[in-house]
Regions:
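Membrane-anchoring alpha-helices and their flanking helix-loop junctions
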Residues: 1-130, 134, 158-218
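Active-site-proximal inter-transmembrane loops
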Residues: 126-149
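General alpha-helical segment detector with a strong preference for membrane-spanning helices
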Residues: 112, 149-150
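Hydrophobic, membrane-inserted alpha-helices
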Residues: 151-158
Length: 218
């Protein structure tokens, strides 16, 4: 139950800081929420990406809640769908997964928030194909082109380690798939079209999600 409660608190903290607080800060500083979600966001590759990410978000919230719900039913060993199948064992593996999960979730939240701040006025949720924003290449963006998404991936992995059940695993897989579609099929083509050679030069040296991996050929 402790692990599930920690995962629930971390999920709420991530949502409040990365979505609510960031939106409020952006609105206060720039007079704009930064959200670019429209009907066009639900067509083509963007629709696939957003659908996967929405499902991942729902499952990510459901995973610790499901673990909490069944934690009072010891007659169900391992839980429904493997909920807390690892956490219920008093083993070294459980201790390691708890520590790693907490570290990754906290680090993922921190990376996400820092990257959002470094984007400044260019920060967006969604994409308006008619809008041109400044290309941010400093800070975390000097080594990774999508550090916000890297942070989100770390957070999801941390949650899956904290509450190792099928819901958390599905959330991780769907979330990573959604980020891949969003970046490769939606954002990278837009940035190449908008910023051209400047984006290509930067993308040849900065990794896609991990430093040194996924750079574009110049």
């Amino acid at each position: 139950m402790t692990r599930a409660l920690l995962a629930t608190v971390l999920a709420v903290a991530f949502a409040v800081t990365a979505l609510g607080l960031r939106t409020a800060v952006h609105l206060r500083r720039y007079g704009d929420r930064g959200w670019r979600v429209s009907h066009s966001s639900w067509s083509g590759p963007a629709a696939r990406a957003h659908g996967l990410l929405v499902m991942a978000g729902i499952l990510l919230c459901a995973a610790p809640l499901a673990a909490l719900a069944i934690s009072g039913h010891p007659a169900q060993p391992g839980g429904v769908g493997g909920v807390e199948s690892l956490a219920s064992e008093d083993t070294t593996a459980a201790t390691v997964s708890l520590a790693a999960g907490l570290l990754l979730a906290a680090l993922g939240t921190g990376v996400t928030v820092v990257a959002q701040l470094q984007m400044g006025r260019s920060w967006r949720i969604g994409l308006d194909p008619t809008e041109r924003t400044a290309l941010v290449t400093g800070g975390l963006f000097s080594v990774v082109r999508n550090p916000i998404y890297s942070g989100m991936g770390m957070f999801a992995l941390g949650q899956a380690l904290l509450v190792p059940n099928l819901l958390a695993l599905a959330a991780l897989v769907l979330g990573l798939a959604g980020l891949e579609v969003q970046v490769r099929s939606v954002e990278e083509p837009h940035l190449l079209h908008t910023h051209g050679e400047a984006y290509r030069r930067w993308a040849s040296t900065a990794g896609r999600f991990v430093p040194g991996l996924g750079g574009l050929r110049s």
